[in-house]
């Protein structure tokens, strides 16, 4: 009789321990720290980004990275809305220019907060949501997403 009670109590304890361990793994899988780095990161990654490679190639077919002015990527120095909007539109329209900007930002340790401020300056009405592709691509360049 005691053996049956001990076996059933052991089975209940093992079942309880495994079910609580499974719940913890679900929390660890779904709660990645990449989304907690910046306040708007979770919202930005949920939006769909549509890219059309044909139009981006038509906009700048003869782009030369050797002719770049490095200071054009300095988002911390941008204070005028028109300059920020111009840079954001250029980055949206040209993948090679955007990649060069991401490398420059990473080398100069530009934070996601600075990028978010720059994008909010570029489009005040939508609080930077218009240029989510730039923010998301920079996060992917830094390796902060699961892609």
Curated annotation (Swiss-Prot):
**Which top-rank group of organisms is this from?**
Eukaryota
Point out the annotated site residues (description: Cleavage): 47-48
Tell me where the transmembrane regions lie: none
Q: PTM comment for this protein?
A: Proteolytically cleaved. The cleavage site directly after the RxLR sequence and the high conservation among other effector proteins suggest that the RxLR motif might play a crucial role in the intracellular processing before secretion. glycosylated.
Q: What induces it?
A: Expression is induced during host plant infection.
Please give the GO cellular component terms listed in this UniProt entry: extracellular region; host cell cytoplasm
| Major subcellular site | secreted
| GO biological process, alphabetically ordered | effector-mediated activation of plant hypersensitive response by symbiont
Positions carrying N6-acetyllysine: 48
- Keywords recorded for this protein, A-Z: Acetylation, Glycoprotein, Host cytoplasm, Secreted, Signal, Virulence
Record's subcellular location: Secreted; Host cytoplasm
What Pfam families does the record point to?
RXLR
As annotated in the record, motif RxLR-dEER runs over 44-59
Leader sequence range is 1-21
Q: What subunit structure does UniProt give?
A: Forms homodimers via the RxLR-dEER motif. Interacts with host E3 ligase CMPG1. Interacts with host DRP2.
Domain remarks in the Swiss-Prot or TrEMBL record: The RxLR-dEER motif is required for the delivery of the effector to the host cell cytoplasm but does not bind phosphatidylinositol monophosphates. The motif is cleaved after the RxLR sequence. The RxLR motif (residues 44 to 47) plays a crucial role in the intracellular processing before secretion. The Glu-rich part localized just after the cleavage site (residues 48 to 59) is required for homodimerization. The conserved, positively charged effector domain (residues 77 to 147), rather than the RxLR-dEER motif, is required for binding to phosphatidylinositol monophosphates (PIPs). PIP binding is necessary for accumulation of CMPG1 and Avr3a in host plants.
What family does this belong to?
Belongs to the RxLR effector family.
**Further notes on this entry?**
The AVR3a protein of Phytophthora infestans is a polymorphic member of the RXLR class of cytoplasmic effectors with dual functions. AVR3a(KI) but not AVR3a(EM) activates innate immunity triggered by the potato resistance protein R3a and is a strong suppressor of the cell-death response induced by INF1 elicitin, a secreted P.infestans protein that has features of pathogen-associated molecular patterns. The 2 polymorphic residues between Avr3A(KI) and Avr3a(EM) are localized at positions 80 and 103, respectively.
Q: What does this protein do?
A: Multifunctional effector that can suppress host BAK1/SERK3-mediated immunity through at least two different pathways. Manipulates plant immunity by targeting and stabilizing host E3 ligase CMPG1. By preventing the normal 26S proteasome-dependent degradation of potato CMPG1, and thus potentially of its protein substrates in the host cell, Avr3a further abolishes host cell death during the biotrophic phase of infection. Also associates with and affects the function of the dynamin-related protein 2 (DRP2), a plant GTPase involved in immune receptor-mediated endocytosis.
Full protein name? RxLR effector protein Avr3a
């Amino acid at each position: 009789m005691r053996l049956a009670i001990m076996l059933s109590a052991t089975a209940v304890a093992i079942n309880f321990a495994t079910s609580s361990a499974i719940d913890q793994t679900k929390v660890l899988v779904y709660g990645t720290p990449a989304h907690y780095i910046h306040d708007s990161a979770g919202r930005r990654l949920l939006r769909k980004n549509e890219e059309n490679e044909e139009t981006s190639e038509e906009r700048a077919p003869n782009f030369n990275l050797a002719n770049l002015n490095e200071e054009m990527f300095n988002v911390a120095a941008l204070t005028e809305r028109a300059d920020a909007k111009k840079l954001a539109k250029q980055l949206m329209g040209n993948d090679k220019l955007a990649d060069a900007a991401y490398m420059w930002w990473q080398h100069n340790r530009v934070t996601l907060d600075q990028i978010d401020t720059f994008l909010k300056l570029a489009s005040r009405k939508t609080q930077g949501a218009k240029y989510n592709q730039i923010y998301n691509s920079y996060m992917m360049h830094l390796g902060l997403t699961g892609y």
